[in-house]
Regions:
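Glycine/proline-enriched, intrinsically flexible loops and inter-domain linkers
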Residues: 1-190
Length: 190
């Protein structure tokens, strides 16, 4: 159909198409491009200690684990929200709202120690993010990788580097869609 959007304070005439997409993901599987997420790495001998000093939740202690952590204001309000993935010892990967990148990045840089114990690097433009979500997402992704994606091997809130076809991606078993799914973080060149 060739649809011309009609502005309205009610449901737009695009509603049926959006509804169809949402239902398909909820009942089957869908692929979403979330490359607009902001991304940075936090590395160095004091990476874990520093992150624990700037977010309210405890950052992941084990390699391969993911935590949802919030940076709070002095009054206890939420200043920022980060998905924090522990890639390796002293190496963390932070994912946060693309619309807040400038704001959140500013706070991270201002709070970073100047003694060289922590390096905070913006890597948003280096990595893309594809979200594969829905009840059939495991089946689709399993057909593209030799990594066992079963619950025992790939737990909720965990991540690992996997082969996807002929490429590699960091697969994070987390998403905010409310269905089974993975975020596939990959080099833009992939």
């Amino acid at each position: 159909k060739n649809i011309v959007e009609k502005n309205s304070f009610r449901r737009s005439n695009y509603f049926e198409f959006i509804e169809s997409e949402c239902l398909h993901v909820a009942e089957h599987v869908g692929l979403l491009d979330m490359s607009a997420f902001a991304k940075c790495s936090v590395t160095g001998p004091n990476a874990e200690g520093w992150l624990n000093s700037v977010v309210a939740n405890v950052v992941p202690k084990s390699v391969g684990r993911i935590g949802l952590c919030h940076m709070l204001s002095k009054n206890g309000g939420v200043r920022a929200e980060f998905t924090i993935y522990k890639r390796s010892e002293n190496n963390y990967y932070l994912v946060f709202a693309g619309s807040q990148e400038r704001h959140d990045w500013d706070y991270l840089k201002k709070l970073a120690p100047s003694d060289g114990s922590v390096t905070v690097q913006k890597i948003t433009s280096q990595l893309g993010v594809l979200v594969l979500a829905g009840p059939k997402s495991r089946e689709v992704l399993q057909s593209l990788t030799d990594t066992d994606l079963g619950n025992d091997n790939f737990k909720w809130l965990s991540g690992k580097t996997i082969n996807v076809g002929y490429a590699q991606a960091e697969a994070l078993r987390v998403n905010f869609i409310g269905e089974l799914g993975w975020e596939l973080h990959h080099p833009i060149e992939m």
